[in-house]
Amino acid sequence: VLIEPINSEAKKLENKKFIINKGLWSSKTKKRLYILDNRLGSSSMYEPNNINFDLHNIKEKKYSDYKVTRSIEVECDTLSSQLESINIRHLDYLKIDTQGAELEVLKGLGNYRPIFIKVEVHFFSMYRNVPSWHKLINHLYELNYVLIDWKTIGSHSTRIPAETDMIFIPNFNNEIGEELIKKNKKKFISLMLIFGQLKL
Protein backbone atom coordinates (compact mmCIF):
# COMPACT_ATOMS: atom_id res chain seq x y z
CA VAL A 1 0.00 0.00 0.00
CA LEU A 2 1.42 3.37 -1.03
CA ILE A 3 0.24 6.77 0.20
CA GLU A 4 0.52 9.68 -2.24
CA PRO A 5 -1.50 12.87 -1.68
CA ILE A 6 -0.23 14.68 -4.81
CA ASN A 7 -2.60 13.75 -7.66
CA SER A 8 -0.02 13.93 -10.45
CA GLU A 9 2.34 11.65 -8.53
CA ALA A 10 -0.45 9.22 -7.59
CA LYS A 11 -1.33 8.81 -11.28
CA LYS A 12 2.24 7.68 -11.99
CA LEU A 13 1.71 4.86 -9.50
CA GLU A 14 -1.64 3.64 -10.84
CA ASN A 15 -0.17 0.27 -11.88
CA LYS A 16 0.57 -0.52 -8.22
CA LYS A 17 -1.95 -2.67 -6.35
CA PHE A 18 -3.12 -0.16 -3.74
CA ILE A 19 -2.63 3.60 -3.93
CA ILE A 20 -4.23 5.86 -1.34
CA ASN A 21 -4.51 9.31 -2.92
CA LYS A 22 -4.90 11.20 0.36
CA GLY A 23 -2.78 12.61 3.12
CA LEU A 24 -2.52 10.83 6.45
CA TRP A 25 -3.18 12.56 9.76
CA SER A 26 -4.47 11.80 13.25
CA SER A 27 -8.06 12.61 12.22
CA LYS A 28 -10.20 13.22 9.16
CA THR A 29 -9.35 16.79 8.14
CA LYS A 30 -7.96 19.05 5.42
CA LYS A 31 -4.33 20.13 5.57
CA ARG A 32 -2.11 22.33 3.47
CA LEU A 33 0.72 20.47 1.74
CA TYR A 34 3.80 22.54 0.95
CA ILE A 35 5.24 21.22 -2.29
CA LEU A 36 8.91 21.47 -3.21
CA ASP A 37 8.90 20.79 -6.95
CA ASN A 38 12.71 20.83 -7.04
CA ARG A 39 12.76 18.10 -4.40
CA LEU A 40 9.34 16.41 -4.31
CA GLY A 41 10.36 13.89 -1.64
CA SER A 42 10.82 16.77 0.80
CA SER A 43 7.27 18.13 0.42
CA SER A 44 5.58 18.38 3.81
CA MET A 45 2.55 19.44 5.83
CA TYR A 46 5.02 21.80 7.51
CA GLU A 47 6.88 24.73 5.98
CA PRO A 48 10.67 24.42 5.59
CA ASN A 49 12.77 26.09 8.27
CA ASN A 50 16.03 27.31 6.73
CA ILE A 51 17.42 28.18 10.17
CA ASN A 52 18.18 24.47 10.62
CA PHE A 53 19.47 23.81 7.10
CA ASP A 54 23.08 24.16 8.27
CA LEU A 55 22.56 21.33 10.77
CA HIS A 56 21.58 19.09 7.85
CA ASN A 57 24.71 20.21 6.00
CA ILE A 58 22.62 21.88 3.31
CA LYS A 59 24.75 24.55 1.67
CA GLU A 60 23.26 27.95 0.88
CA LYS A 61 23.56 27.35 -2.87
CA LYS A 62 21.17 24.39 -2.41
CA TYR A 63 18.55 26.37 -0.45
CA SER A 64 16.51 26.85 -3.63
CA ASP A 65 15.93 23.07 -3.75
CA TYR A 66 14.01 23.42 -0.49
CA LYS A 67 11.91 26.39 -1.56
CA VAL A 68 8.14 25.94 -1.48
CA THR A 69 7.04 26.29 -5.10
CA ARG A 70 3.32 25.84 -4.45
CA SER A 71 0.91 24.59 -1.83
CA ILE A 72 -2.31 22.63 -2.14
CA GLU A 73 -5.09 21.65 0.21
CA VAL A 74 -5.32 17.89 0.62
CA GLU A 75 -7.94 15.63 2.13
CA CYS A 76 -6.48 13.72 5.06
CA ASP A 77 -7.67 10.68 6.93
CA THR A 78 -6.29 8.26 9.48
CA LEU A 79 -4.19 5.32 8.39
CA SER A 80 -6.58 2.89 10.07
CA SER A 81 -9.61 4.32 8.27
CA GLN A 82 -7.92 4.17 4.87
CA LEU A 83 -6.66 0.61 5.38
CA GLU A 84 -10.15 -0.50 6.39
CA SER A 85 -11.59 1.16 3.27
CA ILE A 86 -9.49 -1.13 1.05
CA ASN A 87 -10.20 -4.18 3.22
CA ILE A 88 -6.73 -4.55 4.71
CA ARG A 89 -7.20 -6.02 8.18
CA HIS A 90 -3.62 -6.74 9.15
CA LEU A 91 -0.40 -4.76 8.79
CA ASP A 92 2.99 -6.46 9.14
CA TYR A 93 5.39 -3.70 8.13
CA LEU A 94 4.95 0.06 8.31
CA LYS A 95 7.37 2.63 6.91
CA ILE A 96 6.71 6.32 7.62
CA ASP A 97 8.71 9.12 6.00
CA THR A 98 6.44 12.17 5.93
CA GLN A 99 8.84 15.05 6.60
CA GLY A 100 7.58 15.91 10.06
CA ALA A 101 4.08 14.39 10.16
CA GLU A 102 5.19 10.99 11.45
CA LEU A 103 3.66 11.45 14.91
CA GLU A 104 0.28 12.48 13.45
CA VAL A 105 0.30 9.42 11.19
CA LEU A 106 1.05 7.13 14.14
CA LYS A 107 -1.79 8.67 16.14
CA GLY A 108 -4.11 7.38 13.41
CA LEU A 109 -2.89 3.78 13.63
CA GLY A 110 -6.02 2.67 15.47
CA ASN A 111 -5.98 -1.02 16.40
CA TYR A 112 -3.38 -1.98 13.78
CA ARG A 113 -0.20 -3.35 15.35
CA PRO A 114 2.59 -3.93 12.81
CA ILE A 115 5.38 -6.27 13.87
CA PHE A 116 8.02 -3.96 12.36
CA ILE A 117 7.96 -0.17 12.08
CA LYS A 118 10.56 1.96 10.32
CA VAL A 119 10.10 5.69 10.85
CA GLU A 120 12.13 8.76 9.92
CA VAL A 121 12.93 10.88 12.96
CA HIS A 122 14.42 14.40 12.91
CA PHE A 123 16.44 15.42 15.96
CA PHE A 124 16.73 18.86 14.38
CA SER A 125 13.76 19.35 12.08
CA MET A 126 14.07 21.04 8.70
CA TYR A 127 10.46 22.18 9.10
CA ARG A 128 8.67 24.69 11.32
CA ASN A 129 6.55 23.64 14.32
CA VAL A 130 7.21 19.91 14.00
CA PRO A 131 6.58 18.12 17.34
CA SER A 132 9.77 17.20 19.18
CA TRP A 133 11.25 13.82 18.28
CA HIS A 134 10.89 12.45 21.82
CA LYS A 135 7.09 12.79 21.57
CA LEU A 136 7.12 10.39 18.64
CA ILE A 137 9.26 7.88 20.50
CA ASN A 138 7.14 8.17 23.65
CA HIS A 139 4.00 7.60 21.60
CA LEU A 140 5.42 4.39 20.17
CA TYR A 141 6.41 3.24 23.65
CA GLU A 142 2.83 3.88 24.75
CA LEU A 143 1.69 1.68 21.85
CA ASN A 144 3.98 -1.04 23.29
CA TYR A 145 6.92 -0.74 20.89
CA VAL A 146 10.63 -0.56 21.66
CA LEU A 147 13.43 1.03 19.68
CA ILE A 148 16.00 -1.53 18.52
CA ASP A 149 18.10 0.36 15.97
CA TRP A 150 18.68 3.60 14.13
CA LYS A 151 20.60 4.48 11.00
CA THR A 152 21.89 7.94 10.14
CA ILE A 153 20.31 9.56 7.07
CA GLY A 154 22.27 11.84 4.79
CA SER A 155 24.88 14.31 5.92
CA HIS A 156 24.89 16.45 9.04
CA SER A 157 27.13 18.91 10.85
CA THR A 158 26.33 17.87 14.42
CA ARG A 159 27.93 15.21 16.62
CA ILE A 160 24.65 13.32 16.65
CA PRO A 161 22.78 12.85 13.36
CA ALA A 162 20.25 15.50 12.41
CA GLU A 163 17.89 12.77 11.20
CA THR A 164 17.71 8.99 11.37
CA ASP A 165 15.63 6.01 10.35
CA MET A 166 14.53 4.30 13.55
CA ILE A 167 13.32 0.73 13.81
CA PHE A 168 10.70 -0.32 16.36
CA ILE A 169 9.33 -3.75 17.18
CA PRO A 170 6.69 -4.94 19.68
CA ASN A 171 7.94 -4.79 23.27
CA PHE A 172 9.14 -8.36 23.80
CA ASN A 173 9.55 -7.70 27.55
CA ASN A 174 5.84 -8.01 28.20
CA GLU A 175 3.18 -10.57 27.42
CA ILE A 176 1.31 -8.52 24.80
CA GLY A 177 4.40 -7.76 22.73
CA GLU A 178 5.77 -11.28 23.08
CA GLU A 179 2.45 -12.76 21.95
CA LEU A 180 2.29 -10.47 18.89
CA ILE A 181 5.76 -11.61 17.85
CA LYS A 182 4.98 -15.30 18.46
CA LYS A 183 1.75 -15.11 16.43
CA ASN A 184 3.72 -13.74 13.49
CA LYS A 185 7.00 -15.55 14.10
CA LYS A 186 7.95 -16.35 10.48
CA LYS A 187 7.08 -12.88 9.20
CA PHE A 188 8.89 -11.27 12.12
CA ILE A 189 12.07 -13.28 11.51
CA SER A 190 11.90 -12.49 7.78
CA LEU A 191 11.61 -8.75 8.41
CA MET A 192 14.42 -8.84 10.98
CA LEU A 193 16.65 -10.59 8.43
CA ILE A 194 15.71 -8.24 5.58
CA PHE A 195 16.62 -5.19 7.66
CA GLY A 196 19.83 -6.65 9.06
CA GLN A 197 18.62 -7.11 12.62
CA LEU A 198 19.38 -10.85 12.66
CA LYS A 199 22.19 -12.94 11.23
CA LEU A 200 21.86 -16.53 10.06
Residue ranges and their predicted role:
Residues 1-200:
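Phosphate/nucleotide-binding beta-alpha loop and adjacent structural elements of enzyme active sites
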